[in-house]
Amino acid sequence: MIPWVLLACALPCAADPLLGAFARRDFRKGSPQLVCSLPGPQGPPGPPGAPGPSGMMGRMGFPGKDGQDGHDGDRGDSGEEGPPGRTGNRGKPGPKGKAGAIGRAGPRGPKGVNGTPGKHGTPGKKGPKGKKGEPGLPGPCSCGSGHTKSAFSVAVTKSYPRERLPIKFDKILMNEGGHYNASSGKFVCGVPGIYYFTYDITLANKHLAIGLVHNGQYRIRTFDANTGNHDVASGSTILALKQGDEVWLQIFYSEQNGLFYDPYWTDSLFTGFLIYADQDDPNEV
């Protein structure tokens, strides 16, 4: 059995060189064409062969599994407005709302018909003290007394003063008795008596709302509208002042501070003076 195995192994080994030499016409003398040996170790892989021709298209496979949901697409254009829907059924009444705010007072109605006189009531309580009577006749003149002189006349040097504050008339034209305070813009009464006050105010570019104030209370107010040109607002009054009373001018409305100053051709003046002093003035001689 073994010889046949060896023979089967030797025949291919002997035939391969002979066939190879015949194909190459290589029958050189001394060539070991008939040398036969056992198979050697496996050689390294050869280089990849050239790609073969494309095969025929295979059969269609089975449908694959559903893929994951894709991202939302861009919002499409708005469609045309559809026809109005049918009117729905009337809903149930809602809960009672909160009470609304009190409305504005309506116009005053016409005077009604006089009613019938009522019954006489019981006598009331004693009323309050009446108002002070009219001043009496002027007393004797004390003109020339150094203690009764009080007069001032002052002007401004700036335009558009601040609102609701005493206007500082810091240009002193006269200050007899020294009762006008230029730093505060106030006249402080030093001689009790009857005083006359007047003002002439130039305005430009804005409206002017100015008032004369006595101890924090407006005594007179003047409003002058700006018409595009320069204008003058005036006011005057007589006041009974006590020792320490204060009098000044101020703007009484927002954005209406059109007082205008020009150093070359216009002034705004505030003036006041004592007409006569009180008879019980301790300074009176």
Swiss-Prot record:
<dbReference type="InterPro" id="IPR008160">
    <property type="entry name" value="Collagen"/>
</dbReference>
<keyword id="KW-0732">Signal</keyword>
<dbReference type="Pfam" id="PF00386">
    <property type="entry name" value="C1q"/>
</dbReference>
<dbReference type="Pfam" id="PF01391">
    <property type="entry name" value="Collagen"/>
</dbReference>
<feature type="domain" description="Collagen-like">
    <location>
        <begin position="40"/>
        <end position="141"/>
    </location>
</feature>
<dbReference type="InterPro" id="IPR050392">
    <property type="entry name" value="Collagen/C1q_domain"/>
</dbReference>
<keyword id="KW-0176">Collagen</keyword>
<keyword id="KW-0964">Secreted</keyword>
<dbReference type="GO" id="GO:0005581">
    <property type="term" value="C:collagen trimer"/>
</dbReference>
<dbReference type="InterPro" id="IPR001073">
    <property type="entry name" value="C1q_dom"/>
</dbReference>
<protein>
    <recommendedName>
        <fullName>Complement C1q tumor necrosis factor-related protein 2</fullName>
    </recommendedName>
</protein>
<dbReference type="InterPro" id="IPR008983">
    <property type="entry name" value="Tumour_necrosis_fac-like_dom"/>
</dbReference>
<feature type="compositionally biased region" description="Low complexity">
    <location>
        <begin position="53"/>
        <end position="65"/>
    </location>
</feature>
<comment type="subunit">
    <text>May interact with ERFE.</text>
</comment>
<feature type="signal peptide">
    <location>
        <begin position="1"/>
        <end position="15"/>
    </location>
</feature>
<dbReference type="GO" id="GO:0005576">
    <property type="term" value="C:extracellular region"/>
</dbReference>
<dbReference type="GO" id="GO:0019216">
    <property type="term" value="P:regulation of lipid metabolic process"/>
</dbReference>
<feature type="compositionally biased region" description="Low complexity">
    <location>
        <begin position="84"/>
        <end position="120"/>
    </location>
</feature>
<feature type="region of interest" description="Disordered">
    <location>
        <begin position="33"/>
        <end position="144"/>
    </location>
</feature>
<feature type="compositionally biased region" description="Basic and acidic residues">
    <location>
        <begin position="66"/>
        <end position="78"/>
    </location>
</feature>
<comment type="function">
    <text>Involved in the regulation of lipid metabolism in adipose tissue and liver.</text>
</comment>
<feature type="domain" description="C1q">
    <location>
        <begin position="145"/>
        <end position="281"/>
    </location>
</feature>
<feature type="compositionally biased region" description="Pro residues">
    <location>
        <begin position="41"/>
        <end position="51"/>
    </location>
</feature>
